[in-house]
């Protein structure tokens, strides 16, 4: 139970996993409340009515660098989109955007894509997007995690200036950085989902009798968690053990296309040293580590490990290295012991050494109580120690640790560093560790300050501080960053900002942002269209994929039975048998092959596949025909393809009947019983039985159900994966606005596909379009609305893009090909298949497509499938609306 003071900056303090983000998402209305009640801005946020009314007054910036941004959109386009979501017209949007960019010093980067901004700039842009509608409550979830110290300081200076202008705005912030929490008005310390204490920073420190928040937080932890904790002491390193450097890099460079991730980095790390790599997210730390271990080749420069050049194939050198990634490199479904055994076998430890080594590590790293626990069930600090034990299983001489303490509490962090110091000083293990925590950097023997792929300085922490005349390591880092920014005018981190906050006066009352608004709908549609236009892979798949499928299916699905290889096995050689052979050879469906001379040849050639059918004429065939006696002819058909064999048998039977009718006298062929009616079959459509006329028109609906549905599902699931779905959760956008806004661009692309595929049908496949073009276009429009709605429905059941691709493909292609009249009429289906065929949209558009192309039909003739598609749209939209949640569960 908590009461948050208004009109001030409140900080939630604690490591990852203690419940800060969950609490903030509940307060913002993004996440559902399972139990209890939360009053926000004068009402229960759990009630949809109050949540709808309060949403325009709240701004929520989720955790993660630029998580609420769209990386292919420019700075201006991101802000413009958020302005549309809050109902602002263009004049008001442009004014607010100009003021916000001027205040944050981002005006020079107005047209730069968000994906090309530095971490600090992304956070500033995210803040601008949150402030564009003048919120009364600003919620920031770890806004500066992974950001360099200079950008972090600029970010908080900006917040202070904005609060001076709008003192009535309450700010709720979560952070894991104790130094920045010291500047908040009110703090709430949390652990394991519970509140440890609350008060001003000064009150929390005085309550436990310490002078810094790091120590205060440790004192506030439960006794069980801080039992045995003592201040960390780093003994001096014995330089006498130095020899050949453990790591040596000269001019190490890595480029990805035009982007330089690591730019001519050089350093030397002696054996047994703890070397720290300090820098913000995206500065090149992880890329450098991967090059040093041979996991990633360098573009330029060399990396040496224990005097040997690092290559991806040098397994002997790799066995001297232990690597611990940010994700801990553990198998979640295995127990602690199983993880250790698996990695021991990976490194080829002798069987008799595996058991003792595992027992040694379990004792050394304090894992005795977790031996049979699954890795995924371990507390974060324990999982961290297990990951280090896994990295040490083969007794490496070098440990490379990539941000190993990110997100853990101060006690666990210091305990972890005690292990590292023991390994360095007692076991002579060289440790190369990356971090963005300043206090950790102070525990290293030497550190390199890295920014934008370059090493700014490399020295012991105390020397770096002294060289800059700074008081702390953070101030020293900021000094180096400012010098680098001054030397490079094109840097992403401008040193000059407007000192005045944005002078925005709300012109659109918050109350007007509720209800259905076309501006928000078209805002989503415009943003989706921009992203689709700039995503060459999706756009190529949408347009090029349709053309490719049309060519493959149009030419590949051919049910015509032609060029039938036939051979005669004539045992009579009479004029009658020759006439019979000529009757078959004269058919355009058959290709005459050399005759068969004996039964062995007949069987051999059929088995080899040279022949489709052999017609065997018996001896005395001519004589029997002449005197009207019964005689038989054998037709040996290759049955390896049953459907083709069935058609071949039918052709032979037809030619045989024709020969009998023309050769055998009617009195012999059939007894005359009264007057026989004369029936002649005439086919109204496709008189030549060409399968291309039957298959190409239905192929268009098949393509238009697969690709638009898949694109739609990917468009929604992609937002879930990237985190931009929070913009839907935390803004006044209604579910219908979101559905139709996402749907319109993909429906437009599908209509372009319909036109292209129809033109291909007429020009490439020579299938004439005999009916109403307008009827085809109207039916196509109704159909693509249905198919994109199907994709939206599928997105509700998937959370990854891979699952969306496969799930949507299965859910659309199977009903479309099996129950929609592609291979057999819907009227011929029975049971469940008949029900699916009658309700599935593809069946109705196949009727429209075939009717327009082959039967010259128009609106009046196709009224039933038009009505069926029109009725399907609100049904599918209603299903999408019900499945789409406005809050996280």
What function would you assign to each model-found segment?
Residues 80, 84, 91-109, 341, ...:
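Conserved ABC ATPase "signature" region
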Residues 511-693:
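Extracytoplasmic/periplasmic domains immediately adjacent to an N-terminal transmembrane anchor
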